[in-house]
């Protein structure tokens, strides 16, 4: 399972069609350029002081402004503002939202200059939807590879959270109510996105560490039958909810949801591979899915380690072209209808997936090599899991539950295989069984 362009469209309403968000991130003279765009920029002294505390000196100061600086200077647009002032406040507001929602880093303190630079022209036709998904993919990848105590995660966590709440019964809050929405019968573009279903939710007040352990246990025991595979509906009911009318932007690019294409956000190039999760679209899930080389070299590219590269539009020119061609092909070519979901095929896929991939977070209770017949109970007793149990240390029951479930499934499969190979009797009570 993964977040796809379908989720981006339904939850955020962001455009997928458009130019890939890939440009020069050169920050030389950024203060002068910022002043030209929004009439002011933080001074060096303001950049060094954040929320009243001296920041630690860094080798390279980030180009941009603290969110507190933006709030202090652009919180309210003057009632007698000219058109230019209104446009300036609108641009800064967009910069704030883009930096804080679509492309936040793990610190959550600053709005990078490059996102304001991307808003130099209001009607720039950027593919904001594909960019925010590329950035989220990269942030998830980086977070999985980070093991320090100070590790964090960035990206569009609103998108990730609602994707999870809609599909998985893990960590899902209760949706309490909807606040009244902006009422304008004649402007469909002011309607809410699917995220409005989670406008006001129950507050989680439990201990974070305890909830983390609880979520791990629930994720490790979840089964395919407990997943809501198509929460947005299907066919004619796709995107329909009785609670409110959906913004038409959420369905505008639905013909692009199945594109196999690179997703680009400046230095980050990730691949959108919906054929690996066709079950989420109600389609036939083959196994194994077609292999696609996602190029490990791309994952070594980021702004900090690759400071010499600034013109990302030139560096990633081939991927920009591939994205544009994918959009053209999806829009101009009559696609052959794909086969609908088959439960038997999906069961075969799940069996293959579990056999070739690590699907559990917690380590197994027992190693498979010591579970081969005959069972050596002395070896089992020496295992870490049983040692911890004897010492009275807190252990999860989940690994044992998964072990029992696996053994039951194995026994059922073996029994089925034996029955299939057993000769059928003649009907005169002379069968083999």
Residue ranges of each PLM-predicted region?
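Structural stabilizers in ordered domains
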Residues: 1-433
């Amino acid at each position: 399972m993964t977040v796809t362009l379908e989720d981006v469209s339904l939850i955020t309403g962001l455009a997928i069609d458009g130019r890939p968000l890939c440009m020069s991130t050169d920050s030389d003279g950024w203060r002068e350029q910022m002043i030209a765009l929004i009439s002011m920029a933080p001074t060096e002294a303001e950049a060094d002081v954040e929320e009243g505390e001296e920041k630690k000196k860094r080798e390279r100061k980030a180009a941009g402004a603290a969110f507190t600086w933006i709030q202090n200077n652009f919180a309210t647009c003057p009632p007698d503002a000219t058109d230019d002032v209104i446009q300036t406040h609108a641009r800064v507001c967009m910069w704030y939202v883009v930096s804080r929602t679509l492309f936040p880093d793990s610190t959550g303190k600053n709005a990078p200059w490059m996102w304001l630079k991307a808003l130099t022209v209001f009607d720039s036709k950027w593919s904001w939807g594909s960019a925010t998904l590329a950035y989220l993919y990269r942030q998830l990848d980086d977070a999985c590879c980070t093991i320090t105590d100070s590790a964090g995660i960035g990206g569009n966590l609103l998108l990730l959270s609602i994707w999870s709440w809609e599909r998985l019964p893990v960590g899902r809050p209760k949706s309490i109510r909807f606040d009244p929405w902006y009422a304008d019968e004649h402007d469909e573009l002011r309607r809410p996105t699917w995220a409005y279903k989670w406008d006001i939710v129950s507050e989680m007040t439990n201990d974070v560490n305890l909830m983390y352990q609880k979520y791990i246990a629930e994720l490790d025991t979840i089964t395919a039958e407990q997943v809501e595979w198509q929460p947005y509906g299907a066919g004619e009911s796709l995107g329909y909810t009785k609670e409110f009318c959906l913004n038409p932007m959420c369905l505008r690019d639905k013909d692009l949801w199945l594109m196999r294409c690179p997703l680009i956000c400046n230095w980050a190039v990730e691949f959108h591979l919906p054929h690996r999760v066709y079950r989420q679209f109600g389609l036939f899930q083959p196994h194994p899915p077609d292999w696609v080389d996602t190029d490990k070299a791309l994952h070594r590219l980021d702004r900090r380690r690759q400071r010499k590269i600034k013109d990302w539009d030139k560096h990633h020119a081939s991927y920009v072209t591939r994205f544009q061609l994918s959009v053209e092909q999806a829009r101009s070519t009559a696609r052959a209808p794909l086969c609908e979901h088959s439960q038997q095929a999906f069961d075969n896929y799940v069996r293959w997936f579990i056999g070739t991939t690590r699907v559990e977070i917690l380590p197994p209770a027992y190693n498979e090599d010591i579970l081969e017949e005959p069972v050596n109970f002395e070896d089992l007793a020496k295992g870490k899991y049983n040692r911890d149990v004897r010492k009275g240390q807190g252990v999860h029951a989940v690994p044992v539950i998964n072990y029992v479930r696996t053994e039951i499934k194995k026994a059922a499969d073996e029994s089925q295989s034996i029955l299939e190979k057993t000769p059928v009797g003649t009907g005169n009570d002379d069968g083999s069984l």
